[in-house]
Structures are given as C-alpha cells and as structure tokens.
Amino acid sequence: MNDKGLLFIDEASGLSVDDIKDLSSTRSSGAVTMNKIIKGEARARTRLVWLSNPRSGRNVAEFYWKGFGAFQEYIPVVEDQARYDLVLTAAREDLDVLDGIDSTSMPQTAMWRALFSAAWNLTADQIKFSSDFKATMREVAHKLNDDYGGGPLVVGVAVHEKLLRLSCAMAVLCGDVYDGNLQVTSKHLDWAQQWLRYTLEKPSLSYGAYIREKRRAEQKKQENINWIKAQLELHPALKSLLTASSFKGYQITEILGIDRADASKLLSELLGRGLVKTGRSSSYIPDKLLLDVARQEEVNLNV
C-alpha cells in the first residue's frame, strides 16, 4: 500500500467528506483497512500531498476567509484540518506575471531528483541537531502559538512537529550533509518559522486574519459574560427576562423597578453588545449567550 512512499492526490475535490475521513484515519494510524470479500490491513505510512480546487467550484477570493475558507469547506472536521502540516494556496492574485521563468528551455530535473532521493532515504539516526536547537525550538514554537494558536493550523502542543519537518527540509535544500549526516541548526529553524509565517499570513490564505478576528470575538464574548454577570448581581430580577424567549421593553422598568431612563440605557447596552435582537411587535429576543449565563448563575446559586 505504498508504505513509506509519497502519494499525490490530484483533483481531490471529487472526494466525499467520508472519503477524506477514511484517509485521515489512515494518516493518523499509519494503516489502511480494506473491507471487501475478506478483511485485510496493511501498513500505509505515506507522505500525502493534496491538490484540489475548492469543493464548491468558487474562486478562493469568493470565500470570506479566502483560502482558509475553501480549506474549511473541503475539510469540515477541525480534527482532520489539524493533521495537515501545510496548507498552501495557489491563487491568481499570488503571481500576476511569471518573472525569471524561461519558457523556451526544459528545467534540469536530474539535480532535484538526486536531492529528493537523498533526502527521502535519510534515516532518523542520520539527522543531527545542533546543541542549541532544542532550546531555540521551544522559544520559536511558543512564539508561533502566541501569534497563531487557537485554530487548527497551529496547535501549541504539536506545532514543533511542523517546524522540525520544515527545518530538515531547509537543511536539505542548503545541502548541509556532512559525513553522511544531515546537520540541522537554529539557522534552518529560523528560516522554517519565517516560511511558515509567510504561508499563514499570505493574503490568499488569510489564516492570520482569521485567527486575529477569532481572538477578538472570543475576547468580546468574555467581556460580555463579565458584563452580564455584573448586571445580574446588580439586578437579580433581570434573570427572569434573560431566560424568557422574548420580552417587551417596558418590562425592564416593571420587573427591575428602575426608571425609564435607566431601563432605556440598559436596553441600549444590550442591543449595542449584540446580546438581544429585535423581534415582532416591539419585542426583544435574548441572545443564547444571555440564556446560558443566566442559567449558569442560577445553577451556581442553587449549589
């Protein structure tokens, strides 16, 4: 089953979500199971390269989060998204003009084949790391997680694995093989993290922008939770409104026992924070976050 081989999957947009789940299982376990006339299992420790257009046929630029949005559409399960070492986009806006490409001559592939073959046949004990590599890796991995953690492409406990592979690739490209051993240094690690950052910040992928917006939304959510708790402590009767399916504006005055000016100010704050929305017949509908916090506070009081 192509054990320890390289596998390219082209036109992968034709695969169903279930097909991708099966391949992800193979990727994590290193084994493939066949259920036909008889059941069989074989080792399938492959390095996978996926090539695909967006599943829906839309251009990358049409997705709100550009290439990452297309990736989410193609691989909807977050756990499966995290299995990919690299997610690269090839969009029209990435390269308008081929600069420095001579279309009249064939590329010299023999040198690259030899380099690829040499790298592929390296064993684990032939890869040596400099004495400062481990400490530098810890710092670089922490910084990457600080900048891009919280999403599937940079996971704090596993990002060092991506950096290790990329660092080895950088060492191979530099030809840093001495006495039959690949010498990987902090210099290669620095280039690896720079390149990984470049791919994440690439406008056509938009992962960096996605993470920053995700963190902003999470911070706003926490601020809203703290504000709701403070209001419930100040006005315990507010819980009866927040746990209702809807309420009228005048009920704030009646239930909380506050004047119309204070009620209007409270309602305006709820609307401004996106915690209620307008409904039919001048009613207001609480956001799910309001319901969750109010119910949790009730549970805490009853404990």
Name what the model sees in each region.
Residues 1:
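P-loop NTPase nucleotide-binding/switch module
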Residues 14-15, 22, 56, 169:
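Residues immediately C-terminal
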Residues 16-17, 58-59, 256, 294:
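Activation segment
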Residues 4, 10-12, 22:
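Walker B catalytic acidic pair
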